[in-house]
Amino acid sequence: MGMKKSRPRRGSLAFSPRKRAKKLVPKIRSWPADKKVGLQAFPVYKAGTTHALLIENNPKSPNNGQEVFTPVTVLETPDVTVAGIRLYEKTTKGLQALTEVWAEQLDGDLGRKLTLVKKEEKKTADALDAVLEKATEVRAIVHTNPKTTGIPKKKPEVVEIRIGGSSVAERLAYAKEILGKTLAISDVFEAGEIIDTLAITKGKGFQGSVKRWGIKVQFGKHQRKGVGRHTGSIGPWRPRRVMWTVPLPGQMGFHQRTEYNKRILKLGSEGAEITPKGGFLNYGAVKNGYVVVKGTVQGPAKRLVVLRGSVRAAEDKFGLPEVAYISTESKQGN
């Protein structure tokens, strides 16, 4: 007979405190060490999920060469606009902003999100060259264009994206080229690439201990009293306080989460070819370009998802599998 296992909870304490995210736009706290010149992330909108048939390309798999059913996620990728450039220097207190430059022509809808810089107060590109020696990082300030999608909103999301490159001067030269222009998903990623997805998960509201932490339901006398779905003990008499490790009811969902090493199966420019009959549930038709990612992606439909170059990519042994079929049948349940 083995030792009795203790299981006070199923959820990890590493994610505590489990509270609502402050913003719908996820924070990007780390970047890939990539010397390729270009943006290292791209914001998209989640349309929905479907399934695909892939040709298994793992020679050691019993299904090698055969069609394999795989769930996939479709993300709409409207072009983003580069509104500004910001330079950072590395200090003992972390990265500190040196200066920033905004494009001459800014979208009027951007004023719904932030206060636009007046024309006479805008800095020129010379301000960037003046602090180039101090700069250690170059980032682009981009905003989405949700009005081109089926999402009923005009206010764009603003995301700060790091520009990769072998040197700061090379990154800054690229930043000057794209300032004020629009970029497509094909300018950043390509089919077969391994990426990470960052997004705010689907919110569940205030939930009890059983659903939130997976604790055991108490049967017998407790259940007959109507208290079977509560934490049996929340701690000893002393210390006279409730420890933060106790599984208690509270907010569940609407947290920022990062999923690593997702594969891009397909990029496309015509949304009609991927939209299922009747449109995606709670989303509708894809009107812009799209990207198909293998597996699931966190968050509900219409949620902003940031695709980032992989920071933990392992060796890609098998490469991009052949996509034999992507389902566009109705998701309406008919």
Curated annotation (Swiss-Prot):
GO terms for MF = rRNA binding; structural constituent of ribosome
Cystine pairs annotated here are none
UniProt keyword Ubl conjugation, yes or no: no
Name the segments for region: Disordered.
Answer: 1-20
Swiss-Prot/TrEMBL keywords: Ribonucleoprotein, Ribosomal protein, RNA-binding, rRNA-binding
Q: Where is the composition biased (Basic residues)?
A: 1-10
Entry keyword annotation includes RNA-binding: yes
- An example of a Gene Ontology BP annotation on this entry? translation
Q: Which GO terms describe its cellular component?
A: cytosolic large ribosomal subunit
Domain of life, per UniProt, equals: Archaea
User: How does the record describe its quaternary structure?
Assistant: Part of the 50S ribosomal subunit. Forms a cluster with proteins L14 and L24e.
- Its biological purpose: One of the primary rRNA binding proteins, it binds directly near the 3'-end of the 23S rRNA, where it nucleates assembly of the 50S subunit.
Report the sequence similarity comment from the record.
Belongs to the universal ribosomal protein uL3 family.
Its recorded name reads: Large ribosomal subunit protein uL3
Designated gene of the protein: rpl3
